[in-house]
Structure formats: C-alpha cells, structure tokens
C-alpha cells in the first residue's frame, strides 16, 4: 500500500476510506472486557430499553476507534505524530450488526519550519450502512514530506477549528425516559438554555 506524503494533500480533497467494518458481538465483548467500561447504557440491554433506546448501543469510544481505524491507511502511514482532535460529535447511536464506513475531507495544510514535515488537518465522518452520519470529528497530523525543504510557492491554510461542541448537537433520542423508575431516587436536573429553564 502506498501512502501519501504531505505534498499529496490538497484543500478540499475527499478521501473515501476502504473496507467498511461490521460491528460484532465479539468486538463489543472484547472492548468491554479490555477497558473495564461499566456504563450502564452500553452494558445492560434492559437498562437501555427502559430509558427509551431500541436496544443496547455500542460504546461511543469503540465507535470512534472503528471509524478512526478506517482512515489509518490513507492518513497515518507517513504521519510522525497525531497532534490533536476537535469537534468530536456522536451524531447517532450504532448497534451490534451495523456496518460503519469513513470518509475524510482535507480542510487545512501547513508547512512546518523544519522543512521536513507539514501539518494536515482533516474532517472525518463515519456513516452506518444506511448512509446516516453517526460520528464527525476533526484531527490534525504531522506528516512527512516526500522531499525535504521549504516550498516557496506553498500557501498555508489553518482552519478555524471548533473550540467546543454545542450541547444542542448532542444526540438525545426523542423517546428517552430520563426519569423513569430507573432514576426514581435521583433529583431532577435543571438545564439552562439561554433564558429558558428546561426540566428533563
């Protein structure tokens, strides 16, 4: 497999990453046993159903790694370092049996002063088998140059990355029962949206 160097990335390029990945019971079992995750939503089918999910969703971090993993052959083979992430949004739940695919758009490029590397900024999107967006995020990587030296004609473009994820972008199922019998001993939460108090 021939990976790209810094010079091969251009603003606006779309990379459709190969080999979509179906999520299996085994993936989830290994993830839960390896990480020790005990989030009830991802750990208990009964809990998930009681609060309004159709079934037990896959842990968000496992989903992230599944989507991220599709991008590695196209983005990471000539990368020296993974420099950061921004604007990570889990848009829709994913379930065992779903198949996720990934696509990335080049949104920024910048030469580094050492002349040996550059920084590539990408926006990656994960979709399920129905074409629904399930995850979006930005990341930036330090990438090797094919040929060392500063390219005089090169124009840096550093994107304006999101500094936070707006709470309005969080996924909340329409039929979510936050205060069913499962939460009978908990206090009600009060969220402040601008000047309106919303009780959930």
Language model region names:
Residues 1-84, 146-200:
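Hot-dog-fold acyl-thioester-processing enzymes
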Residues 1-11, 92-177:
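HotDog/MaoC-like acyl-thioester-processing domains
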Residues 88:
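Active-site-proximal cofactor/substrate-binding loop regions of enzyme domains
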């Amino acid at each position: 497999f021939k990976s790209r160097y810094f010079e091969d990335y251009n603003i606006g390029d779309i990379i459709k990453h190969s080999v979509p990945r179906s999520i299996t019971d085994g993936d989830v079992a290994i993830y839960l046993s390896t990480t020790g995750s005990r989030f009830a939503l991802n750990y208990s089918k009964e809990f998930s159903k009681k609060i309004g999910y159709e079934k037990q969703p896959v842990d968000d971090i496992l989903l992230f790694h599944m989507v991220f993993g599709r991008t590695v052959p196209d983005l990471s083979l000539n990368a020296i370092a993974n420099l950061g992430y921004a604007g990570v949004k889990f848009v829709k739940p994913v379930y065992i049996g779903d198949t996720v695919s990934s696509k990335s758009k080049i949104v920024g490029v910048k030469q580094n002063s050492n002349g040996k590397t550059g920084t590539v900024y990408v926006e990656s999107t994960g979709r399920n088998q129905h074409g629904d967006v399930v995850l979006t995020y930005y990341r930036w990587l330090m990438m090797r140059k094919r040929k060392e030296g500063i390219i005089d004609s090169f124009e840096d473009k550093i994107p304006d990355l999101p500094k936070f994820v707006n709470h309005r972008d969080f996924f909340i199922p329409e039929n979510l029962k936050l205060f069913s019998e499962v939460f009978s001993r908990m206090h009600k939460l009060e969220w402040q949206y601008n000047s309106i108090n919303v009780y959930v």
